Amino acid sequence: MRIEYSSRPKLYTRIIIPSKSGSAFQYRSTTCLHHSQKPTWVSSLDLGAKMDPAIKSELEKYGDDVLFRAVTNHTQSTWARTFHSSPELFIQPQSIAEVEKVVNLARRCRRRITTVGCGHSPSNITCTSSWLINLDNFNKILSADRETGVVVMQSGIRLYSVGEQLDAVGLAMPNLGSINHQSIAGAISTGTHGSTLRHGILSSSILELKITLSNGKTETCSPDQNEELFRASLISLGAIGIITEITFQAVPAFTLSWEQTVDTDLRMMNNWDKTLWTQTEFVRVWWFPYTRRAVVWAAEKTDLAPMPPPKSYYDAWLGYHVYHNLLALGHYVPSILPWVEWFVFGMQYGFANGSKSSAIQPSRQALLMNCLYSQFVNEWAIPISKGPEALKRLSSWLNHLTPDDPDYVAHGIPYSAEGLYVHAPVEVRVTETSNSLTPRPHLDPTCTEEATLYLNATLYRPYDMDPPCHARYYQGFEFLMRELGGRPHWAKNFETTGEDIEAMYGENLENWRRIRNDADPEGMFVGEWHRRFILGNGPRLALEEVETGRKKFRKGGVLVEGVVGGFKDEEDEGEGSESGESFDMLRASEMK
């Protein structure tokens, strides 16, 4: 055993335990609250004692030099600090061989594996008490062909790094969502999209994937090779395997000239079927329900020299903190929120209709927006033709409109909005996948018969406080979205039942389940979120993680706890693979 010391006294940085056959195990003890933080090393003469002896025993049997980079005492948090979990091990592989080793070890040790990137999904989809893999150190662009635009990259690379490195060789991603913190694999796996009728969701640009399955083997899939696995893995929700390598179709780097205009929501909706969504290549809208106004952001490619955007109220220190504290005040006095919308809207975009601002920026900057504070986000995809109806009904409900109001429509939402005050804006975006020539993911939420409209109802959590309107607002919002034929964004917060999801996806969901079960028959990549929303009421799987409880977390949100195989009875648990003998039997069977 070799111990390497840090420069700080009495703190150990890592322990390397070589096995008899020369294999290596890199192990650290840390109290990180988020994987983006540097580990805080704790004093311990025997860090290895913190690991399950069965896992240590199995590690020592490996006859290779492939590292197992594991961390204990890690608490994983979503970016919004809505959910937290304490995995048994937090693992950061740096090669496909290391990923395969983690999967093989997990199978022998009867552990579930969850993969996490930046944690920007505010749901509990990545919560685990078992093993958590993060690929932040598996983040290289392996090749980029400027002539063809074909780029091969490791799956842990963040989108901002993709943009920076592609720009250096004259390339760019054809489209981006509102943020670029996600890993490329995480963005693909949840159906990330931008806002344009000339592009589909991010996975539309994927040419090929490599994915490590529960048997420890890495498979290549594409439209021409393993097409069914490819279609299932494009939106895998982390339940099929670990995406390790991505081949992506980039485009020549481009600059966008954008302009945003304040107007009434009535004028915006009257232009809905005319030029609203086709005036430029990229268009998005922020709708403010209480002031009944909208900001229309439109961008087109240009060869003009860059021109920085005007200073944003949100981005200035004073504006950022004033808004944050007004939201916090609204937590206790919700009735001020319509005024907060009017004030902050005016300071950010202008108080008068017709107010404009503009800029010229590289696409990788122009397409982004500041997410500001911790938040819940509930986004649904509906047919674009249903957009005006959706906004008018939501406005009538939130504003308690009566038939004598010229903007009144019957909202039909069977929940009271009395005393309900929400945050703004509602983000309105579009994609077009109905004419796509590329294979559709089985769990693609977009429309097949027409373009897709996304409505994103954001609720901020000022100082990590859940807004009092949260449950009722989303209850009414989701009712409306379901009535209009909508489907929820997989990475966002939603409460729609698994039965509703089955009705929405039908045969596509059945096909996805079949492919998933073939790739991972024991449920190594399955957790409570998957069971609740997409796996239905079928039998629990051997390595499936079951949620056992939730606790209030000391810094806001909830701590989710689970157990692998928690559905088994005591007799079954007594027959699990927790002995060295059973590990050897598993290993022997795999080598046949």
PLM segments and residue spans:
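Noncatalytic alpha-helical scaffold of FAD-dependent oxidoreductases
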Residues: R2, Y12-I16, F25-Y27, T31-K592
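Low-complexity, intrinsically disordered Ser/Thr/Pro- and acidic-rich segments
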Residues: S21-S23
